[in-house]
Amino acid sequence: MRVVGEIPHPDCKITLFAWNNRYLIKFEQGLLEQTFKIHEYDVTSEADLRALVDETFISETLSRFEAMRNSLRNRLNVIG
């Protein structure tokens, strides 16, 4: 797996990878992560890959992190 780059953001870590004829966009926030896989033929360049990760996409991803955190917290409360 090759690191293509990182996209700076104050609320999460965003790393771009190239691997196995795919690009991966990995978001990390604390102990949670989300990875999006995109076939390399669906974008024409790494610049296109970066263009996909706009503020709308990041905002939607951050909202999912909140939902993931709530879901995990609720499940941990069941066993705790």
Q: What kind of region is each of these model predictions?
A:
Residues 42-80:
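Mixed-charge, Lys/Arg-enriched low-complexity segments
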Residues 36-41:
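Generic detection of short hydrophobic beta-strand segments and adjacent strand-loop junctions
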Residues 1-34:
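N-terminal acidic leader/helix
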